[in-house]
C-alpha cells in the first residue's frame, strides 16, 4: 500500500467512525487519533523528510485536504449532538401554557398599620388634620414646649435616648403639636390635629415593652373647649376601635402638659367587665391618657390661655393592636413572621 492509498484509507475509516459516533466523547477520540499531536495524519506530515522531494507537495496537499474533510464532518457531527442536547432539554423543561398558573399569595397590612389607617380615616372624618414630624427632635420641642423645663422632675419618667445635649430621639409625638400650635392662625378656625409616629424609650425589650413603639397624639384648641368635649371624644374613639358596647371610665392622673389629667379605661372585652386575668380581675383595661391642655403649653406657643383652651390625648397604636387582636407578645410586631401577619388579612376589609 503506497502512501496515497494509506491517506485515502484513513479518510474513509475516519468518515465511517464519525458516522457511527454516538456522542461528543467519541468524536473527540476520533479527532485525537487522526489529527492530534500523535495522530496518524499528523505522523505522515512529520515523516515528510523521508518522502521524495518531488512527492512532498502532493502528499502535503492530500493530507491537508483529508484533514479539512474530516474536520468539517467532525464539526457537523458536533453540532448535531449539541442540537440534540438542546432539544432534549427543551422537551424536559417545556411549559404547558394551557395549565393554570400558580395562585399569587396576597400580602397583608401590618396590624399596627391597620389600626393607624383606621384611626387616621376616623379623625379626618371628624375634621382633624394628620401631622407627622421628625423622629429626631430637639429638647425644646419635645420637653420645654410641653411644660417640662430642664429641671422638671417628670423628665425622669421619660428614659430618653439623647444624641447630644439638645437633640434626642423623641419620647412622644408632642413635639408635632407644639410646632403646629405655635404657627396656627386661630382667626381661620380652631386647631384639630392628630400626630402619629414612632417614639423611643430606654426600655428593655420583652413581651410587653419595646424601645421603639408607635403613638398617636391628638390636640384640639379653640375657645370654650370643655372637659365634656374631651370625654365625648374619648368615648367615641373607644367605641369605634373596641366596639359600641364598650363602657368607659376616666380616672384622675398626672401629665405635665395637661391639667386636669385623666386616664381612660374600657370595660374588659374578654370578660365583659366581670373580672379575668387580662383585666387583672378589675373588669377594666387602661387604653390611653388625656387631659385639658396646660395653660403653660399654650403660652409657650404664643397662644393666650385666657382666651383659648383645649384638650389633648395620647394613645399607643401598639397597645391598641395588642388589645384589639389579643396579641400576647409585642415582639411579634417586628419579627416579620409571615404566618403572624397573614392572620390580619381579613381585618383589611
Swiss-Prot record:
GO terms for biological process: phenylalanyl-tRNA aminoacylation. Mg(2+) binds at residue 259. Its cofactor is Mg(2+). One of its GO terms (cellular component) is cytoplasm. Binds 2 magnesium ions per tetramer. GO terms for molecular function: ATP binding; catalytic activity, acting on a protein; magnesium ion binding; phenylalanine-tRNA ligase activity; transferase activity; tRNA binding. It comes from the Bacteria. It catalyses: tRNA(Phe) + L-phenylalanine + ATP = L-phenylalanyl-tRNA(Phe) + AMP + diphosphate + H(+). Its EC number is 6.1.1.20. PANTHER family: PHENYLALANINE--TRNA LIGASE, MITOCHONDRIAL, PHENYLALANYL-TRNA SYNTHETASE. This is Phenylalanine--tRNA ligase alpha subunit. The gene is pheS.
